[in-house]
Structures are given as C-alpha cells and as structure tokens.
C-alpha cells in the first residue's frame, strides 16, 4: 500500500509506504519451519475480484537468504521483524490507464501455504493533515 502523492514529492519512497494502517500483515505469523521452500511460494493479488498480480517468490531479484544476509551486515534482525521485498508486476499506478485504489475497493492477497489477507480500502478522514 502506497500513498502516491507523498511518494512522488520526496527523494525516497519510504514515507509513502509508512502511513498508519498502510502495512497490513496477517492473517497470522508463520515461522520459517512452517513454510517449506521460501523460494517456491505463489503470490497473488486481487482488487475487487480482478487478478492484478500473479507471481512467485522464485521471481525475487535477490533470494530470501541473500536479503537477510545483506540486511544483517548493518542491522540486527529480531524475531518478529518484517522484511519487505517489494511487489510483483501489476501495480495499478503503472497500468495504462492507471488503476488507483479508491474507497470501497477490496484488496485480497494470497500466498500459498501462508494464507489470505483481505482488506477494504477506506477513505482518508476529512480532517487529516496534508502537506
């Protein structure tokens, strides 16, 4: 989930991906011993029932082990830490024409062997502060 107007105004994308409620996780935590091969998991995203992303963790640019190895050269990872890897092809912002999420949309993400997460898109409150 990204706040594109914030993302495009600053030199890094971090702020546009760091808003409260914009990093849904779940429906539960799964430990590595429950996953099997982390490089063979189908990842799919639907918006209002339309398949938008269909990929596999084998398509990651860097495999999970290389990501963890690289991150731990500068940071200590603790149990429960989350490593975000990016997103597969199918991002609405780069579709022609673009397909941005709007209030009322329902986003469903499934990762084989891990579960399904489904969330509605909620409108930003009228009184929220904007830069």
Q: What spans do the regions from the language model cover?
A:
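Catalytic-pocket segment enriched in acidic/His residues
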Residues: 2-131
């Amino acid at each position: 989930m990204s706040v594109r107007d914030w993302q495009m105004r600053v030199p890094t994308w971090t702020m546009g991906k760091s808003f409260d409620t914009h990093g849904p996780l779940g429906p539960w935590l799964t430990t590595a011993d429950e996953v099997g091969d982390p490089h063979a998991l189908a990842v799919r995203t639907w918006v209002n029932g339309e398949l938008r992303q269909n990929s596999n963790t084998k398509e990651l640019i860097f495999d999970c082990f290389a990501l963890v190895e690289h991150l731990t050269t500068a940071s200590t990872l603790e149990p429960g830490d989350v490593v975000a890897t990016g997103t597969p092809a199918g991002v609405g912002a780069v579709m022609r024409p673009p397909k941005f999420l709007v209030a009322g949309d329902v986003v469903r993400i499934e990762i084989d062997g891990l579960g399904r997460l489904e969330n509605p898109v909620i409108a930003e409150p009228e009184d929220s502060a904007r830069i």
